[in-house]
């Protein structure tokens, strides 16, 4: 006699799925900070039902294990430390699922001066002799724009570095 039940996947109850999803979320959050939408996406990839995902995200939010405001502030500091500008960081935060109000709150950190960060990045990377040539100045401006700095921040960094060396 053949046991046919061995071929069928075992159906877990809602409570069992919830427990497994919570365990997965805790392991995931122990490794690194996540936005709520990022955690939900990872749970979806694991195949959990939407009701389970919502319950787990609410559970994690209740214990403050997942907090979009905290995640946004951390991502802004981390991006600035990597030499990324505000445009690039905003784009990444939107991609991670934060709304505009949360992103604006994350950027309200008084210790970050984007103009000085652009200048510091340019000081580390650019040769001051390059700044005498217009084409090379434009190359460095394009570099800063590619890193997510605004045109104004890039022009400030170029002129400030040039002024320091005169």
Positions of predicted regions on the chain:
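An alpha-helical, amphipathic repeat domain used for nucleic-acid recognition
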Residues: 1-166
């Amino acid at each position: 006699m053949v046991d046919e039940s061995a071929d069928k996947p075992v159906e877990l109850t809602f409570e069992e799925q919830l427990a497994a999803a919570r365990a997965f979320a805790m392991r995931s959050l122990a490794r690194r900070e996540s936005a709520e939408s990022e955690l939900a996406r990872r749970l979806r990839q694991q195949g959990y039902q939407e009701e389970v995902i919502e319950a787990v995200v609410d559970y994690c939010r209740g214990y403050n294990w997942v907090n979009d405001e905290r995640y946004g502030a951390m991502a802004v500091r981390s991006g600035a430390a990597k030499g990324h500008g505000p445009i690039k960081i905003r784009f990444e935060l939107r991609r991670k699922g934060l709304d505009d109000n949360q992103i604006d709150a994350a950027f309200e950190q008084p210790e970050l001066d984007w103009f000085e960060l652009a200048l510091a990045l340019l000081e580390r990377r650019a040769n001051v002799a390059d700044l005498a040539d217009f084409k090379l100045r434009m190359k460095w401006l394009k570099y800063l724009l590619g890193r997510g700095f605004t045109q104004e921040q890039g022009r400030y960094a170029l002129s400030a570095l040039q002024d320091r060396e005169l």
